[in-house]
């Protein structure tokens, strides 16, 4: 299935789930007879943000039958005070959808904004910023789509596509007597699109290159060691990709990029989200 179709299906699923969390009736809006009023509202950015989540907000708007028009596209940088979009419909429906739409936009835009900061920081290098699987449960596609809108690249979405042999898998190999080379070969036989191996020592790096790993994951090392290990890996296995992760922040990410990382994966893009500051205002007299 194409990625765009995956996003559309996920948006419809998440919109239904999020609205269901608020129950079948909005007692407050019913009490003030909000459904009798046709209203217009606007979504504002209270601080600079990279907009994301529009497809998901659209899915909510369709379910509650309000009209949502965007003043900017997904992935656009919105200045503080900028109008993101407008809504028209009966006030009861707008109020019912308000928090759901904002929750989706604020989380997605928060992810896109921090991702864009990382991408901008490594600009001019050959390095790509990646997400990890450290996403909120049930929000994998949503979170990853937001990373993309911020300029990040696609990593593995699940355990079925790319094999990644990490420290605990190394421990399993040691216990069952299987060699790394055999594990890499078996992963390919099982249909792995690629095989990535985490290395923590120079000896593991040598073994991973000999086993035919497509990419090496270098975790919690210094930029200097990354440079040394990366150069050695490319001597042993020309074309092998180098991914850095662990202990990387906006303050030091460029050092890792300049040290030769092809990819840098950052868990904080999705596991420590700071929501974008967005608000929905009902226009007076509407």
Regions found by a protein language model. Give the residues of each.
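Short secondary-structure boundary segments
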Residues: 220, 246, 267-268
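A generic signature of intrinsically disordered, low-complexity regions enriched in glycine/proline
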Residues: 171, 223-224, 281
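Short, charged, intrinsically disordered terminal tails
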Residues: 268-286
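Ligand-binding grooves and catalytic loops that recognize ribose/phosphate and carbohydrate rings
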Residues: 248, 256-263, 282-285
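Short acidic, glycine/proline-enriched helix-loop-strand junctions
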Residues: 235-241, 284-286
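Acidic/glycine-rich phosphate/pyrophosphate-binding loops and surrounding catalytic core
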Residues: 1-200, 204-211, 215, 227-232, ...
